[in-house]
């Protein structure tokens, strides 16, 4: 997609797919610029319910979502430049994204999104649990922000031990996880 800034070039060999994620038939790899059209579609998929209620023509909705994706992509690359920008694949098809920034005190899940057909199958849970194990080993906690209206995601995060940390009345809630014994 022309006009969008590229993903940072990675010098490492690539991420290791957590065993539980692999057992579910998925794998992780670094996002590339060639993924941008599919990531744009993924973004639109994650906001489909929200935008369905808006009385706009289909082309106006798509234009809005494309623009929102571009703004989000630019924001992530500027504010989380050192994050791991990973895509979740199944049978070679991009099915999701997992953007994770390692911190000194806490790791931040910048974004975790899966296409509708892959939600509720344990993939997100397996990704987060693997990240929690890694963070705990390093003595770090984890933080994420969830859309207030995304009750299913909030419930998952609560089951994984995340607790509400901040509610400023906006569209997102901050949730934190502390490693056991921390």
What would you call each of these model-derived segments?
Residues 34-35, 122:
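Short helix-adjacent coil turns
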Residues 120-133, 155-159:
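Conserved acetyl-CoA-binding loop-helix of GNAT-fold acetyltransferases
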């Amino acid at each position: 997609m022309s006009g969008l800034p590229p993903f940072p070039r990675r010098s490492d060999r690539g991420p290791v797919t957590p065993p539980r994620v692999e057992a579910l038939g998925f794998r992780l790899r670094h996002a590339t610029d060639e993924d941008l059209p599919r990531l744009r579609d993924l973004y639109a998929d994650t906001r489909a319910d929200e935008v369905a209620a808006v009385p706009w023509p289909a082309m106006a909705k798509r234009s809005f979502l494309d623009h929102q994706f571009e703004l989000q992509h630019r924001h992530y690359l500027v504010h989380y430049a050192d994050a791991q920008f990973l895509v979740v694949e199944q049978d070679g098809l991009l099915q999701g994204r997992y953007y994770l920034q390692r911190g000194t005190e806490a790791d931040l899940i910048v974004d975790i999104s899966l296409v509708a057909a892959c939600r509720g199958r344990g993939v997100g849970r397996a990704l987060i649990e693997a990240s929690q194990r890694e963070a705990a080993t390093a003595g770090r906690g984890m933080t994420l922000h969830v859309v207030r209206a995304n009750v299913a995601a909030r419930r998952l995060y609560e089951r994984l031990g995340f607790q509400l940390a901040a509610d400023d009345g906006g569209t997102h809630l901050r949730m934190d996880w502390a490693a056991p014994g921390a």
